[in-house]
Design a protein with these regions (language model features):
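Ferredoxin-type iron-sulfur electron-transfer modules in oxidoreductases and energy-metabolism complexes
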Residues: 25-40, 52, 62-67, 71-106, ...
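A ubiquitous short alpha-helical element
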Residues: 9-12, 58-64, 98, 205-206
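A broad detector of the eukaryotic-type serine/threonine protein kinase catalytic domain
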Residues: 74, 95, 99, 113, ...
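Short, cysteine/histidine-rich loop/knuckle motifs that typically chelate Zn2+
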Residues: 48, 56, 68-71, 115-118
Length: 291
């Protein structure tokens, strides 16, 4: 358990937003982070409940709603480790259930916080921000790459089709097990919707690229601009690899048959986000022109 009286001593404190007059001038992430000392205080608010509803994802309505973490993250454990300053073990516990916490620590809607018992009598623990702190600190310390290196290679070759969150997660875990992994992506950059479907101010693309670079550094192969069925056939994949994992994502939009759908300027969201992000990444600056 963290501080037994932490939930009484400390108020909830979220990661602060950058000043408005600063953040309207660029496409950088909206939020900054707390100091290490402040982060430990936030972790101290976790009571390590006898039945921690935060860490167990419970689905309702046929899977349409969820309470608690769908990943079953070991939240009370790594909150206590943050409070104690044992950031290495906190990282190990976090990545036991979540291979890409730098993504979820930024864009997850955090149903864990809604399920936090502390929320019944005040504000829930800042689980979302605590998760981000653990993984960002781990990257700074150089722990992430080491955690993904296998002890030995199995000689088993696996192709992963698609480099979105599912494909990257699969590639990371398979590489840890010692298999030789190659990730195929039809786009010019890796990351899928992490790269092109989420605005930069929510998930800086440097964060996504950092993960890709880390994976490449520990032996995972990446092949861009390659569409299965056009540039390489499924039969060729099956000949070259022992197994093939399809993680193609959900890039095909669902249209709406409603009045006004064909009006000028009405576009699919992912198409719009992809174009704007590509323009941003291909430009020389992330700053906006003066108003």
């Amino acid at each position: 358990m963290a501080d037994p009286f932490g939930f009484l001593k400390y108020e909830r404190k979220d990661n602060p937003y950058r000043p408005v007059n600063e953040r309207i001038k660029d496409f950088e992430e909206l939020q900054t982070t707390l100091s290490v000392e402040e982060r430990q205080k936030q972790a101290a608010r976790c009571m390590n409940c006898g039945i921690p509803f935060c860490h167990e994802g419970t689905f309702y309505g046929g899977g349409r709603a969820v309470s608690g973490c769908p990943n079953d993250n070991l939240i009370p454990e790594w909150n206590a480790l943050i409070y104690k300053g044992d950031f290495r073990r906190a990282f190990e516990r976090l990545t036991r259930t979540n291979p890409l916490p730098e993504m979820t620590g930024r864009v997850c809607p955090a149903p864990c916080e809604k399920a936090c018992t502390e929320g019944l009598n005040g504000s829930g623990v800042t689980i979302h921000d605590n998760e981000r702190f653990i993984i960002d600190n781990a990257f700074e310390e150089g722990w992430v790459a080491d955690s993904g290196r296998p002890i030995e290679r199995t000689g088993f070759k696996v192709a992963v089709v698609g480099s979105g969150p599912a494909g990257l997660s699969a590639a990371w875990r398979l590489n840890q097990l010692g298999h030789s992994v190659t990730v195929f992506e039809r786009s010019d950059r890796f990351g899928g919707l992490l790269m092109y479907g989420i605005p930069n101010m929510k998930l800086d693309k440097k964060i996504v690229q950092r993960r890709i670079d880390t994976m490449a550094s520990i032996g995972i192969n990446f092949v861009a601009n390659t569409e299965i069925g056009r540039d390489i056939t499924a039969e060729e994949l099956l000949e070259k690899f022992d197994r093939v994992i399809l993680a193609t994502g959900a890039s095909v939009p669902r249209d709406l048959d409603i009045p006004g759908r064909d009006l000028k300027g009405i576009r699919f969201a992912v198409d719009f986000l992809t174009e704007t992000t590509k323009n941003l990444l291909d430009s020389d600056t992330h700053e906006l022109p003066p108003l």
